[in-house]
C-alpha cells in the first residue's frame, strides 16, 4: 500500500487503511513539529499552489507545511497566470509538471481538477472545489479522533448547506464507520451522487447515513456538531435568498442541548457568527474550531510527504 505518486482529489478514492496511514503519519509529524525536531522529508521539492478562489488557512498551511518539510511552495494566483486568460488546463498541467514536484489547486469546477490530474505527471492535491473539500474533511476527522479517541460508532451531525464540505464529510464518515446525519433545507441537499458513493462505503463500514431537513432531529445524541457558511465562495450573489432559506439551520445553544453533553463543535472556517453558528457556541467550551484549523497543517504535511517524498 503506497500513496507515492498518487493524486489526492477525493476521500472517496482512499481506502480505510490509507486514511489511517495519513492520520498516523500526521500524528508523528505533529509531535515532531511540537518538539522542534526537523523532518525535511521534502528537501529540495517544490509545490505549485494554484488559487482561483480566496484562502487564509489553505494557503498558509500548505505553504508553511512545505517549508517545515524542507521544501518550498509557490503561490500562483489564477489572476496572474495564463490559465486565467484561457490557457487550457491540460497545457498548464504539463508545463507545471516540468517545474514542480506537486500541484495543489483550489478552484470552482471539480472536472477541471480531474483534468489537471489526468495531464499532470506529478501528484495533484484538491484544495477545494465546488464539489469537495477533502483536505479539510481529513483534518476534521483527525481532530475528532484526537478528541474522541475512536471514530467507529460515533455520530457527526452536519447542519446547513449541502455543499463541498458536507460532501467530503459524507465520504469520510462512511469510510471510517462514523454515523452521519445531515440537516439541510430541502432545496439545498448534498449531491445525490456523493450520497450514493457514501452509502456504498457505509455498507462496508457499518456507518448510518441520515439526510433530513430537521436540525433538531439530526442533532440528537451527536458526538460532533458541524456547520459551514450558508453561501460558499461563488454563491455570494445568492446571499439574501439563502439567508431566508437557511433561517433555523444554525448551531446555537438549543441545538447543542440536543447533542451529547460532551459533543464537539466544528466549523471549517471562515465563520459567519449569527448565521450558521452563534457567537456563544463558536467561542464556547465545546468548540474545537482552532484545533481543526491547526490540524490542516499536520494532516496536509502527511499527505504531501506520502505523495511526494522519494
Ligand atoms: N477552511 C478553509 O479552507 O479555509 P480557507 O478558505 O481560509 O483556506
Ligand atoms: N463551503 C465553503 C468552504 C470554505 C472553506 C466554500 O466553498 O466557500
Can you say where each PLM-predicted feature lies in the sequence?
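Positively charged, low-complexity intrinsically disordered leader regions
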Residues: 1-60, 64
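Phosphate/diphosphate ligand-binding glycine-rich loop within oxidoreductases
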Residues: 36-145, 273
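Phosphate-coordination loops involved in phosphoryl transfer and adenosine-cofactor binding
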Residues: 42-47, 152-154, 262
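Glycine-rich phosphate/diphosphate-binding loop of Rossmann-like nucleotide-binding domains
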Residues: 52-64, 148-227
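Short, structured coil segments at secondary-structure junctions
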Residues: 69, 99, 119-121, 176, ...
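Rossmann-like adenosine-cofactor binding region
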Residues: 200-279
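Adenosine-phosphate binding glycine-rich loop
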Residues: 262-263, 269-310
Amino acid at each position: 500500500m503506497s500513496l507515492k505518486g498518487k493524486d489526492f482529489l477525493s476521500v472517496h478514492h482512499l481506502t480505510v487503511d490509507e486514511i489511517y496511514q495519513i492520520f498516523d503519519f500526521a500524528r508523528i509529524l505533529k509531535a515532531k513539529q511540537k518538539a522542534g525536531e526537523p523532518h525535511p522529508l521534502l528537501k529540495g521539492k517544490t509545490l505549485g499552489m494554484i488559487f482561483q478562489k480566496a484562502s487564509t488557512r489553505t494557503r498558509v498551511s500548505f505553504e508553511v507545511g512545505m517549508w517545515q518539510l524542507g521544501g518550498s511552495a509557490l503561490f500562483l494566483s489564477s489572476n496572474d497566470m495564463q490559465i486565467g486568460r484561457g490557457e487550457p488546463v491540460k497545457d498548464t498541467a504539463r508545463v507545471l509538471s516540468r517545474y514542480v514536484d506537486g500541484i495543489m489547486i483550489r478552484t470552482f469546477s471539480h472536472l477541471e481538477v480531474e483534468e489537471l490530474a489526468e495531464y499532470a505527471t506529478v501528484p495533484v492535491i484538491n484544495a477545494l472545489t465546488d464539489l469537495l473539500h477533502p483536505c479539510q474533511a481529513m483534518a476534521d476527522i483527525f481532530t475528532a479522533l484526537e478528541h474522541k479517541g475512536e471514530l467507529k460508532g460515533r455520530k457527526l451531525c452536519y447542519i446547513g448547506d449541502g455543499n463541498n464540505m458536507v460532501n467530503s464529510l459524507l465520504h469520510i464518515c462512511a469510510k471510517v464507520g462514523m454515523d452521519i446525519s445531515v440537516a439541510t433545507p430541502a432545496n439545498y441537499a448534498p449531491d445525490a451522487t456523493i450520497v450514493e458513493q457514501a452509502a456504498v462505503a457505509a455498507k462496508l463500514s457499518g456507518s448510518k447515513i441520515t439526510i433530513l431537513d430537521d436540525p433538531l432531529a439530526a442533532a440528537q445524541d451527536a458526538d460532533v456538531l458541524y456547520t459551514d457558511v450558508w453561501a460558499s465562495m461563488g454563491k455570494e450573489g445568492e446571499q439574501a435568498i439563502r439567508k431566508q432559506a437557511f433561517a433555523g439551520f444554525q448551531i446555537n445553544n438549543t441545538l447543542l442541548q440536543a447533542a451529547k453533553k460532551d459533543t464537539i463543535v466544528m466549523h471549517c472556517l471562515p465563520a459567519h457568527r449569527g448565521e450558521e453558528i452563534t457567537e456563544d457556541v463558536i467561542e464556547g467550551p465545546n468548540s474545537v474550531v482552532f484545533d481543526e484549523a491547526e490540524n490542516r497543517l499536520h494532516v496536509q504535511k502527511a499527505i504531501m510527504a506520502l505523495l511526494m517524498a522519494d
